Amino acid sequence: MIDAIKNVSSLSATRGLGSIATDLSSAASNAIASTPETAIGSSAVGSFASVMSDVAKNTVSTLKEAENASFAGIKGTMSTREVVDKVMQADQTLQTAIALRDKMVSAFLDITKMQI
């Protein structure tokens, strides 16, 4: 079921989040190695996009793990406790992603209501 989610390109108007993350990976690695003052100046543009990409990828991978664990539990190859742990972790990750989405939509609506 979750395997149908291949990418999150619908979140970007022109390209998927994966390409944004690959474009900015060198800037992020340079920012980690540098001082805080230079990191703020060099990667402030791409940091939000890379964080959002990582959150989306983490959410999808956690949901896939929970789905695989539930199938393993049905087959009897995984204990009930492990299945419940994976499903609860996926539920918590999904609730976090939903809360993040709601905050982003709320912030966008606040920005659109501002007078110019």
Swiss-Prot record:
Belongs to the FliE family. This is Flagellar hook-basal body complex protein FliE. It comes from the Bacteria. Pfam families: FliE. The keyword Membrane does not apply. The keyword Phosphoprotein does not apply. Keywords: Bacterial flagellum. Its main location: other. It comes from Rhizobium rhizogenes (strain K84 / ATCC BAA-868). InterPro entries: FliE. It is found in: Bacterial flagellum basal body. One of its GO terms (cellular component) is bacterial-type flagellum basal body. One of its GO terms (molecular function) is structural molecule activity. One of its GO terms (biological process) is bacterial-type flagellum-dependent cell motility.
